[in-house]
């Protein structure tokens, strides 16, 4: 009968272990005294920053979502301290990621509050952007982005 209590104690010790060791109670964003650091750099030439496990954005790059440029962003999930990417807070709980783009950790949306005064006056050099669109082309692109975002979200829903 002595092995039964010993086995019970071993099972109890194993079952009360903490399996996720790098996250505090409440998640990694609940660190009260930890300074917020800049998120991992990503994208071509590491000129962007991770906004989520599949999102990499930069001022000059725009945003990459679910592309090979975002593979490094998965590492952010395993780091114990919280990070903050981007500029000022914007819609849907996100932060300004690129001119006119607001990203949270799982999605990006077009947001005019992320346009600074200089971005309207700033000229884009041909090396930075090979195409300039008129209003109707940019409206079409915006609609396509919204459709792709809705399709991506519907893939992750379970019925």
From Swiss-Prot:
GO terms for molecular function: neurohypophyseal hormone activity. It is found in: Secreted. Disulfide bonds join 18-23, 39-83, 42-56, 50-73, 57-63, 90-102, 96-114, 103-108. Its main location: secreted. Glycans are attached at residue 129. Seven disulfide bonds are present in neurophysin. The modification Glycine amide is found at residue 26. SUPFAM superfamilies: Neurophysin II (SSF49606). InterPro entries: Neurhyp_horm, Neurhyp_horm_dom_sf, Neurohypophysial_hormone_CS. Gene3D superfamilies: Neurohypophysial hormone domain. One of its GO terms (cellular component) is extracellular space. Keywords: Amidation, Cleavage on pair of basic residues, Disulfide bond, Glycoprotein, Hormone, Secreted, Signal. Residues 1-17 form the signal peptide. Vasotocin is an antidiuretic hormone. Belongs to the vasopressin/oxytocin family. This is Vasotocin-neurophysin VT. It comes from Bufo japonicus.
